[in-house]
Amino acid sequence: MDRHDHEPNAHVPIEDRDELTYYEKRTWAIQSLLVEKGILTADEIRRQIEMVDSQTPADGAKVVARAWVDPAFKARLLRDAKAAVAELGLDSGESPVLVAIENTAKVHNVVVCTLCSCYPRALLGLPPDWYKSLNYRSRAVVDPRGVLREFGLELEPDVEVRVYDSSADMRYLVIPERPPGTERMSEAELAGLVTRDSMIGVTKVRSPEPQPDLKASAPA
């Protein structure tokens, strides 16, 4: 027989709420109606939720890495992001318009959704809690440098900061600057450097850690 014992005071127990929130009740009501009217099945809803929960920033990182190594692709990406993403066999999501915006040495772009949490989930996965917070949504527009500073990013005074407000009809993907020291890296290795936050614009992509010279350290 399996046992599941707890030592006294081992950890704080999880306390479930007895009542659903307003939005949870509304979600369940809509889901029940969709199933009842035969528009969707419970399994189709479950599979869609599972698919959304499984999305990660990996696809977005692939797009960025390709743009870094292929100038022609980057030009197409900046011109028509949805079409360029489709070239890689990737899904850019349900939003009618996806816009790629490039960070440079003189221009730094930041994305926010001032109304809710609109976000290119198909490429970046679920939005982080801070992206959905009122603090970020309200301050990113009026004090972007201050917000970036809180993420540890201090920009030079001569760098222009542009803030893009995402919406249900238009999502944005930041193409961060390629960091120095990556000239000999493969496309797959470059993708491994790209983070979710850099594709939102609140951080830069860091240069890879220097690798030790094994030949130099080997005994003669």
What residues fall within each predicted segment?
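Terminal, compositionally biased segments used for targeting/anchoring and flexible tails
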Residues: 2-220
